């Protein structure tokens, strides 16, 4: 299987994973030019998704691509997995802290730990 076909398969797998978790609009993005308006997958609001389905990943290169392509308009992530492994998500620590702080606090200052 060539890398383009494997990439497309990974994008479909990630979109299906997102749909299984309640993001029913998740699907592959438009694959014609790169950039903010054409991430690998769409359907997670405010997240620019770079999807990698490879056995060996240079995570720093993949993050640089996601950061560059999101043009500062979304939180860049890299969702990646190897054969027979679970999905992992890589993101900048500053972005993770923003999301985590929002998750643990609501208007009354309660902490949510599901």
Give, region by region, the residue ranges found by the protein language model.
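Catalytic phosphate/metal-binding cores of nucleic-acid and nucleotide-processing enzymes, i.e., regions
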Residues: 1-114
């Amino acid at each position: 299987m060539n890398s383009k076909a494997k990439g497309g398969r990974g994008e479909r797998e990630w979109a299906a994973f997102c749909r299984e978790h309640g993001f029913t609009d998740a699907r592959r993005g438009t694959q014609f030019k790169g950039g903010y308006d054409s991430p690998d997958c769409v359907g997670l609001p405010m997240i620019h998704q770079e999807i990698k389905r490879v056995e060996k990943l240079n995570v720093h290169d993949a993050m640089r691509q996601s950061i560059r392509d999101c043009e500062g308009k979304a939180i860049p992530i890299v969702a990646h997995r190897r054969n027979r492994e679970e999905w992992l998500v890589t993101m900048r620590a500053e972005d993770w802290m923003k999301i985590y702080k929002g998750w643990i606090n609501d208007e009354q200052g309660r902490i949510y730990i599901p």
